[in-house]
Design a protein with these regions (language model features):
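Walker A/P-loop nucleotide-binding motif
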Residues: 10-32
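A short hydrophobic beta-strand->loop->alpha-helix junction that borders the nucleotide-binding pocket
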Residues: 49-50, 58-66
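Mid-core helix/loop region of P-loop NTP-binding domains shared across ATPases and GTPases
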Residues: 53-56, 67-75, 82-141, 187-190, ...
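C-terminal alpha-helical "lid" subdomain
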Residues: 185-272
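The catalytic "switch" region of P-loop NTPases
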Residues: 116-120, 127-211
Length: 272
């Protein structure tokens, strides 16, 4: 609703922050939504994807660790294959990104690993101002995905119990809704819905409805502790194994063959 409203509304750019711990599925949710949004547009406006000026409704970029504004903007522009002058400043690249997004009619900008935008209080104010400029100049919806990004970085309006005084940071935070991504409860409707969705996307010849969402729901939860990201990784490896061995179906026996990841082992210790 926020994305569609932004396309047809002339108001200020709006945003969504997906915040939570590592392995909780923030990236999976973001990529899944972005993919479905672009597919819906492709089905509705197929000719738009064949026009002379490239139509790129969604931009996705995983931000760099320890990088400043200029490096981050350069990294995002690489998604478009856009050449960048070595003499350009961070502000120049912000303007360049806005120009490219408008040319490509990008409505949705997804910035993953957004905790890497946190570079220090004063510089966070500068980042907040630039993000606000991008949202307004490109008239886009911005999705920020990262570890606890509602507590630190350009979206944080309080640090150490003190309210931030930066107008840019406050204005940016007021435009964002925050979705806290948490592990899903065993047997919950949300957990069942997640596994059902994964079932519909499996490209396995012999998979059957309910294989994951009913028959192996508890087994998958035990291996992932309800963390969406861990569950996705587990089932992706299991699906590839089923393809490689010719079984074309995820079973309990096959699932036991998938070695637990370091991510899963670490998360399980934290929950315990």
């Amino acid at each position: 609703s926020i994305v569609q409203g932004q396309v047809y509304d002339d108001g200020p750019g709006m945003g969504v922050a997906l915040s939570g711990g590592p392995g909780f599925g923030k990236t999976a949710v973001t990529v899944g939504f972005a993919r479905e949004y672009e597919r819906a547009l492709a089905a509705q406006f197929p000719d738009a994807f064949n026009q002379t000026n490239e139509f790129i409704p969604v931009c996705y970029s995983s931000l760099l660790r320890g990088a400043g504004l200029k490096a981050q903007m350069h990294h995002i522009l690489r998604f478009y294959g856009h050449p960048v002058s070595l003499r350009a400043t961070g502000a120049d690249l912000v303007d360049e990104l806005i120009l490219v997004m408008n040319t490509c009619k990008t409505h949705l900008l997804c910035l993953d690993q957004a905790q890497n935008l946190h570079v220090g209080d004063k510089r966070d104010d500068q980042v907040a101002a630039c993000l606000k400029d991008i949202m307004d100049g490109a008239h886009c919806t911005l999705i920020l995905t990262g570890i606890d990004i509602h507590e630190t970085g350009p979206l944080a309006v309080a640090t150490g119990g003190r309210r931030q005084t930066s107008n840019d940071r406050l204005q940016l935070a007021r435009r964002f809704t925050v979705n806290r991504i948490q592990p899903l409860a065993r047997g919950s409707q949300e957990w069942t819905d997640l596994l059902t969705t994964i079932e519909t996307q499996l490209v396995l010849c012999d998979t059957k409805p309910g294989d994951l969402s009913h028959a192996m729901s508890d087994s998958i939860w035990d291996r992932s502790q309800g963390a969406i990201g861990v569950a996705f990784n587990l089932l992706r490896v299991a699906a590839n194994t089923a393809i490689n061995d010719g079984s074309e179906r995820i079973t309990r026996t096959l699932l036991r063959k998938v070695s637990p990841t370091i991510e899963h082992a670490t998360l399980k210790r934290k929950v315990a």
